[in-house]
Structures are given as C-alpha cells and as structure tokens.
Swiss-Prot record:
Disulfide bonds: none
Localization per record: Secreted, Extracellular space, Apoplast
Protein name: Laccase-20
Cofactor binding notes: Binds 4 Cu cations per monomer.
Species this protein is from: Oryza sativa subsp. japonica
Record's keyword terms, sorted: Apoplast, Copper, Glycoprotein, Lignin degradation, Metal-binding, Oxidoreductase, Repeat, Secreted, Signal
Gene: LAC20
Pfam families tied to this protein: Cu-oxidase, Cu-oxidase_2, Cu-oxidase_3
Length: 580
C-alpha cells in the first residue's frame, strides 16, 4: 500500500532555483498515513509521512519560499509545526495545534506556505497535536544563499535524529497522561528510526543506523532530539566533534568528544573521519535525573560509523565503544551548554541593552483537585491530578478553537485572558532540596487551578525573561521552546537566580541565539529578545509530559505601526476552525 501510495503521490519537490543566488520555491507533499512496523518481536501500527521514519527532509536555501501540502489519511486530526522557523509575519503557518490553527481533520488537506528569512542551519518539523510527533517528524535544513559556511565545507551532511520507540498507541498515551498516568515508557532510544543492535528479542537483533565515511573527509552531523522524555548524550568512539551551530544559528567553533541535545534542540557538529580505518560504534544515551526522582528504564541506541575499505567483520577486530557518562549524571549537559557561544559574523544580531519588560518565571509542579472539586485530599492522592506550572499557573489548552483566530477576530471572551503573571505569587527558596519529596512544605506552594492565561506585548518591546527551575519539579531540566523567535541566551546558572550576583555573568558580546532554551536542573537561564514578529506565539517546555501537564503559555505580539510590521490577514489556503 505504501509503495503504491508513494508512486502516485510521491514527494513533489519543486525547487525553482536560483541562477545567481535568487530565491526559489521548495514544494513538498506530505501524505500522513498508517504503517505497520515490527520491532522487538511485536508489530505496532504507527503514523508516518510518505512511508518514512523519520520523515522526509525539507532542504531549502536561505530566502526560499516553502510550500508544503499535508494530506491527512489517519483517523486523527493533526497539524505540522516548523520548529524554529521564525515565520516572520506568517504566524498563520506556524502549525501549533489550537494555538495558531485547528487540526487538519481526517481525510482533509492543508497547505502551509512561508518564507525562510535570515536563518541558516538545522531546524526540524513535527506533528503538533497529541503525541503524534514521536513518529511524524523530520529534519528542516536551511543552506546559506551564497553556499559558503564559516567553517570547512563538509563533503556531506547527515541528519542524526534521536528519538524513542513506543509500542503503546500514541493517542492512547496522550489520553493516559492527560488523566494523570505517567507510568508508561518507551522501549528503546532510536537513531534515525533504528533501535540498534543492543536491542534484541528471541535472538533477533535490531538493525543499527550506519554512517559510511571515507578517511580524511569531514561530515556535518545535524543532531536533533525528537524524544518525549530525555536529553541525550551522543558520542562516536575514536572521534571528536566541532560544534558549529544550534537551532538554525552559527556558534563559535567548540571542540568536544560528546554532544548533549535536549528535546527540541538541533545541534550542528563537524566530524572528521581521521581515525584509523575501521568500524566505530556511535551511542545515543538518555540522560535521566537521579533518585529520589522516579526512575525509568535506560534508553540507549547504538549505531555504527563504517570506513570504506574495511570488511564487514571489521578485519577481525573488536569494534570500539565510546565511554559514556553515567546516565544519571546531569552535569555534562550543563557544562556542554554553558560552553556554547554565538559566532560573531557580519550579519549577527546585537543584544538589546535596554529592557522594557522583565519577567521572572518559576517552573514548577504540583497537584490540583480532579474535576470541578475545589477541595480534596492532597499528598498525591487519587483525588488530585498532577500538573506542571509557570508562576503557579497550569495552562489549559483550548480544544475547539485556535487562540490566533480569537485574537485576530477580537473575540477572546471565554477562551483566554491576558493576565499571565510576570512573577511568582510568592517568593521562596526555589531550589530547596526539602521540597523534592511531596509533603507539607511543598503543599502550600502548589497551584489551585488551571487557566488559559496569556501575555500581551506591544510591538518592538525589549523583553528579558529569567526561567527558574524549582525543586517542586524534583530534578527535571526544562527545554523551553518559544515559537516565532530566536532569543539571546545571556547566561545559565545553578541554584536560585540572584540578580545582584548573577547579572554580572550575562554575555552581551556573543551569546547564543536559540529557539529552545535548556533551563538546567536546579538552575536558571536568562534570555532577551525584541518583539518584532506580530502574532500569537506558543511558549512551552518540550518534554511531552510537561506540555500535557500545563507548562505553557502564549505571547501575543501586537502589530507595529506599518503594514510591513503587522500580521497580514489569513492567507487563502488557511482554514478557520469552523471550516476545517
């Protein structure tokens, strides 16, 4: 079925390219359909795009127009989000379910059309309704218009998409988590959809991802984390990396033997095949919090780097394995991210030195009473449901309308309010270890309600946000993703943020530009940005369970003074919720 489907609807790629570097049009058709896949002795029905797992790579050049036709042949509604694409004045195409649009119904089609402006590097795309992004995802590569990189040009670039293999139906997984059940786990990590040969069932060894290389040549690995639950450590035995980019922006080259990538992040690394020709294992290992956090299985996938000219049994030699950190050691992730800085180049943007609005966001966890009850037995009883919060508010996601439509039409009543708190309701010691186990100290800080509270900004406002992890989260880090923007990551630190002490750590010279900010376990991150892109922009943690639990909000950015600084009306291909 898949083969005939792809023959008739095959990915239509129209690249009207560029003589003399002119922008073109890149056009694809994404057919979303069911497919049976067998792993670990069991056959699972999954949802994919064009018969591929991961899905097709969208490969464009800076300045191109992208047109994607999505055909929904699965029994569930879905949207496609272009993760990290700035969507300048094209918020209608962002693809955030119930934020910018209602889902594409089963049997229907939708076209996304947008420009790619002032971005170069690796982004990605994924489904943005329920848990479908586990298998509906792929790389989104933006190449420089002049074909020149600020680092040695690789002979080849290779997406390395790290994910998870779930046997549980993903729509059922979403339902279970919304009901407060967080006991389900994937069976394995994956590299480019392969579980790897460390996984087996009844003697049947799973297939590994294989990267074929030639000695002396360099390769650009585009490492993307699509997983629900974990950061990942990624290494190749006998090789080092030079980190050159992240989230569609260049970085100051940084040498390391290991990459750490959080859910939502995309990290670009150069790898030179300079080891003695042989086979070398690559490992993706999930980094998971230590006790007393709930302990989950070890997720790992093993792939292979294979040099040309080496026979299938590695000339009779053992295949080297990389030495990995302890899976519960979170500090390598902190140090990796802290060592990254933005690359100074002619087009780099400068940090706003003046701040118009300062926001302090505490990332927390707690319980509320189930149903419409206002009182209930606490201490994680069956009368409560666990929620995640930002400044003590757990976000209620709409499920019948889209926030962008309501904002554009001027009809927010009964759907959202614009009173998202810009600071926590009560200060406390946010990283007090005594708050980790549930108990009376934690209970007085817990939220009491869910709501759809948004924050509105005037156009061209300079905003500073301090994200603070709390021990109410136990030991989770938090990859916070802001749609529609790149933000300057000024600093990260451990412990509770202290302005007098920590502002001196801010990097105003060459900070990273990121769309996904990893707020470290028991620590904080400081960002700044200018609200120069009007629309409705979703802000959320990229751990799937935190999204479902309510660690989210949306920013409304008003129109500027001119048509060129304003959100245009919905394009002809946009389908309103009542017409979906």
């Amino acid at each position: 079925m898949v083969a005939s489907l792809l023959c008739t609807v095959a990915v239509a790629v129209l690249a009207v390219a560029a003589v003399g570097g002119e922008a073109g049009v890149v056009e694809h058709t994404f057919v979303v359909h069911e497919m049976n896949v067998t792993h670990l002795c069991n056959t699972t029905k999954i949802f994919v795009v064009n018969g591929q797992l991961p899905g097709p790579t969208v490969d464009v050049t800076e300045g191109d127009t992208v047109v994607i036709h999505v055909v929904n042949k699965i029994p569930h509604g879905l949207t496609i989000h272009w993760h990290g694409v700035r969507q300048l004045r094209s918020c209608w195409a962002d693809g955030a379910g119930f934020i910018t649009e209602c889902p594409i119904p089963p049997g229907s089609e939708r076209t996304y059309r947008f420009n790619v402006t002032d971005q170069v590097g690796t982004l990605w795309w994924h489904a943005h309704v329920t848990c479908l992004r586990s298998t509906i995802n792929g790389a989104f590569i933006i190449r420089p218009r002049d074909g020149k990189y600020p680092f040695p040009t690789p002979v080849k670039d290779v997406p390395i998409i790290i994910g998870e293999w779930w046997e549980l139906d993903l729509v059922e997984l979403d339902r279970r988590m919304r009901d407060g059940n967080f006991d389900d786990n994937p069976l394995s990590a994956t590299i480019n959809g392969k579980l790897g040969d460390l996984s087996n069932c009844s003697g049947i060894v799973e297939e590994s991802f294989v990267l074929n290389v030639k000695h002396g040549e360099s390769y650009l690995l585009r490492v993307i984390n699509t997983a629900f639950f974990s950061e990942y450590y990624f290494k190749v035995a006998g090789h080092t990396f030079t980190v050159v980019g992240a989230d569609g922006n260049y970085l100051t080259p940084f040498k390391t033997d290991m990459v750490t990538v959080a859910p939502g992040e995309a990290i670009d690394v150069l790898m030179v095949a300079d080891a003695p020709p042989a086979h070398y294992h690559m490992i993706a290992l999930a980094n998971q919090p230590p006790e007393p956090d709930p302990q989950i299985p070890k997720y790992i996938s093993r792939g292979l780097v294979r040099y040309t000219g080496v026979d299938a049994n590695n000339n009779g030699l053992p295949v080297p394995m990389p030495i990995m950190p302890n899976q519960h050691n979170t500090m390598p992730s902190y140090y990796f991210h802290a060592n990254l800085t933005g690359l100074m180049h002619p087009k780099h943007r400068r940090v706003p030195m003046h701040v118009d609005e300062r926001i302090f966001i505490i990332l927390g966890l707690g319980t509320i009473c189930r149903g419409r009850n206002t009182t209930c037995k606490r201490q994680r009883s069956l009368e409560t449901i666990e929620v995640a919060t930002m400044n003590n508010v757990s976000f209620t996601h709409p499920n019948t309308t889209a926030l962008l439509e309501r904002y554009y039409d001027g009809t927010p009543e009964g759907v959202y309010t614009e009173d998202f708190p810009v600071r926590p309701p009560r200060p406390y010691n946010y990283t007090n270890p005594a708050l980790i186990p549930p108990g009376p100290l934690e209970e007085v800080l817990e939220p009491t309600f869910k709501a759809t509270k948004l924050k509105r900004f005037k156009y061209n406002t300079s905003v500073e946000i301090i994200f603070q992890s709390s021990t109410l989260l136990m030991s989770d880090s938090n990859p916070m993703h802001l749609h529609g923007y790149d933000v300057f990551l000024l600093a990260q630190g451990l412990g509770s943020f202290n302005a007098k002490r920590d502002i001196r750590k801010f990097n105003y010279h060459n900070p990273q530009l990121r769309n996904t900010i990893l707020v470290p376990r028991g620590g904080w991150a400081a960002v700044r940005f200018i609200t120069d892109n009007p629309g409705m922009w979703y802000l959320h943690c990229h751990f799937e369970f935190h999204i479902i639990m309510g660690m989210a909000t949306a920013f409304i950015v008003e129109d500027g003074p001119t048509p060129e600084t304003s959100l245009p009306p919905p394009p002809p291909e946009f389908k309103r919720c009542d017409a979906s």
